[in-house]
Each structure stands twice: as structure tokens, then as C-alpha cells.
Amino acid sequence: MLTRKQHELLCFINDRLLQTGVSPSFEEMKEALDLKSKSGVHRLISALEERNFIRRLPNRARALEVLRMPETATAKPTAAASGKAKAAAPAVPQAANENVLEIPLHGRIAAGLPIEALEGQSSLSVPAALLGPGEHYALEVAGDSMVEAGILDGDYALIRRAETARDGEIVVALIADAEATLKYFRREGAMIRLDPANRAYDPQRYKPDQVRIQGKLAGLLRRY
């Protein structure tokens, strides 16, 4: 039973250890969680230690070990976020608990409406373990253009707000300030290419000033 900040810090530490094998610095943790001082990081780490989620390794600087993650962490759909197909997605939770967070649900990805214009329509209950650090929102997927990435019509795409992306990441792209779409992001020379995950659809190419990134896919939920 973690607070949102405790959960964000635990996910940040775990992700950094998986990526680099080295714990993040207190300064990095402070910036990632948008805290005003390192004392806030110390308090969060102490709370995670008391709950046996992490431990500090003795006689080693910047040495933290993640002992366990919240139970719902096993459902994290990292393959979909990295662009690899998945046969199934975690189901939408039906009952609220302390490991479930409410994030804005902006409706279906719709032509003619930038994401900002869809603010505050409703909310979606999401297992906290699916959300790492950062600000998130959800979109209901419309259509079958991403089926080969395991993203089906009616799924809920969990989006981490971002303005930039690396090649191969799945993003919400706003095209010409008019049409929002969920696609693979790639740079191709002086152009931006948005790739579907369905052979029935063709890639679309745009000038960089025609495409604005509004977030990156962080996870997926499915209602059964």
C-alpha cells in the first residue's frame, strides 16, 4: 500500500536498475519526481525501506536494491510499449483499492480535436504498477491500424505525456494541429514517418513542423 509518490519513486529506481544496473542519484530522483528538496527523497526511501520494498546496500554509495514490486506490477505490458506484439493486455480493474489510480480518460483518438481539447471528460481506474513516473492520461483506441502490436479496437492506451520520442516508440502524434493518431514514430531523412502496425495500412510521411508529439505509450488495458 504505497502513496503515489512512493510508487513513482519505486518504479523509477527499478527501471534505472534494469536499464543501467546502477541506482539513480538523489538529485536524479528529486528531478524525476519534481520534488523541491532531497529531504523529500530521503523520506520516500525510508518509507519504502520500512515497507520492505527496497534496501540500502551497506558500504556502497548510491546502492539500492529493489526487494519487491507491488503485486500488480507483474501485469506491466512492457512489450507493447517497446513495439513488440502482445496477445493480451491486462483487464480494466473493476474495483478500486489503494494500488489503483485514477487518470484522465480523454475518449477515443478523434480527428479534428487536439488532445488538449479533450481535457477532463472522464477518468479511468488503472493499476498503479502500470504507471511509472510522469503525468499520464488514457485514450480509447479506435480502429485496427495497430493490431500487430497487440493494440486492438476498444483497448485503453495509457499515455505518458511527452513532447519528444525516439525512433521505434509508439506515440500519440498530432498532425497539422488537427488529427491525433497512435502510431510508431520514426525519422526518415528530413521527414517524420508514422508507421501503423497493420500491413493493410501504409506509412504516412510528414514534415517535422506538421507533427507534434503529445505522449508515448506506457501501457495497455483491455475490457473483457
Swiss-Prot record:
What are the EC numbers? 3.4.21.88
Which GO MF terms does the UniProt record name? DNA binding; serine-type endopeptidase activity
Q: Which GO terms describe its biological process?
A: DNA repair; DNA replication; negative regulation of DNA-templated transcription; proteolysis; SOS response
Top-level division of the source organism's lineage: Bacteria
**Recorded catalytic activity of this chain's protein:** Hydrolysis of Ala-|-Gly bond in repressor LexA
**Entry-linked InterPro entries:** LexA (IPR006200), LexA-like (IPR039418), LexA/Signal_pep-like_sf (IPR036286), LexA_DNA-bd_dom (IPR006199), LexA_repressor (IPR050077), Peptidase_S24_LexA (IPR006197), Peptidase_S24_S26A/B/C (IPR015927), WH-like_DNA-bd_sf (IPR036388)
Q: Which UniProt keywords apply?
A: Autocatalytic cleavage, DNA damage, DNA repair, DNA replication, DNA-binding, Hydrolase, Repressor, SOS response, Transcription, Transcription regulation
EC main group: hydrolase
**Classification via SUPFAM superfamilies:** LexA/Signal peptidase (SSF51306), Winged helix' DNA-binding domain (SSF46785)
What are the positions of the active site?
A: S145 (for autocatalytic cleavage activity), K183 (for autocatalytic cleavage activity)
Does the keyword Cytoplasm feature in the UniProt annotation? no
Q: Which residues bind DNA?
A: 26-46
Q: Where is this site: Cleavage?
A: A111, G112
Per the record, the similarity remark reads: Belongs to the peptidase S24 family.
Q: What does this protein do?
A: Represses a number of genes involved in the response to DNA damage (SOS response), including recA and lexA. In the presence of single-stranded DNA, RecA interacts with LexA causing an autocatalytic cleavage which disrupts the DNA-binding part of LexA, leading to derepression of the SOS regulon and eventually DNA repair.
Assembly with partners or alone:
Homodimer.
Q: Give the protein name, as stated in the record.
A: LexA repressor
What species does this protein belong to? Rhizorhabdus wittichii (strain DSM 6014 / CCUG 31198 / JCM 15750 / NBRC 105917 / EY 4224 / RW1) (Sphingomonas wittichii)
